[in-house]
């Protein structure tokens, strides 16, 4: 592992040459040259499919594919690569858990606790399952600190509570709840815990064994990897108890017109030809990330968010929704619609997001219809902060009467 060097880190992202001032890494991270090269090499030099053909090139590709599974397991400190299921991303992983593990075990009146801070991907699947089974979704509200109020969790848990769905890190505020305490309380009541790691994975790799996490999902594209690839971690006994969600090739051990026998997990949960290129690219991203001190990189990103927040706070009407000095800065200006402001910022070459960030209940709890969100990554610079502040000043001159 090398000490973090902002200039060296930034130099590895060719897209920055044409991305403007890129402050939208919470939506998707840019890709380093190492990931681009791995993906290019796969398409130029690889032959065959995984877990199917017997010729040498296909066998080598299968070995790389399974080595990537082991790399993800090591990154999460999972006991085994067999505890990792490939998915298209966090959304598919959560839906898989909801439909394959939770739905068959729910009865009418059972309860699914979901934090108010969740991305829609960790809320809508539970609303769907509740509608299918007669269970109900119970809200774990925000506290005064804009984090899920873990202190109120004990009072919400009842004998009918079955699942806790909670995010590792908010994609709006950047706030990180006390996962360890939430998991302890849920497990004491016999509940299963689904952790959405989509936003948090790149900032704080989760130790799934130390936290005693039941299910954990993340997406490659927010982790400097390709789009369309993600992973689900599940405790081995929980994955073994899941019935296949999709049927098709590769996931069966035996099939006839009388029925079929699925492969054991994780393979029985991975129907069809997988996204091999995505797996190779994700593995390359994790290998590349391991070369830098992630903690130092995170501190750099946080310092940029603090610098931006301090500068913008000097402008009249500024309001920040940032939590815990995170690298995400969600903000608004009184009397100015976020869509108007982000349009003018885009014209100035500032790439960030405005709107509800796929978190409508959270925005409602914050009392706003939408925010702007500048999400800082280790490849950003103090010059990027200065450009953002300058562009905001120019926009305010136009928008403020």
How does the language model describe each region?
Residues 1-401:
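Pyridoxal 5′-phosphate
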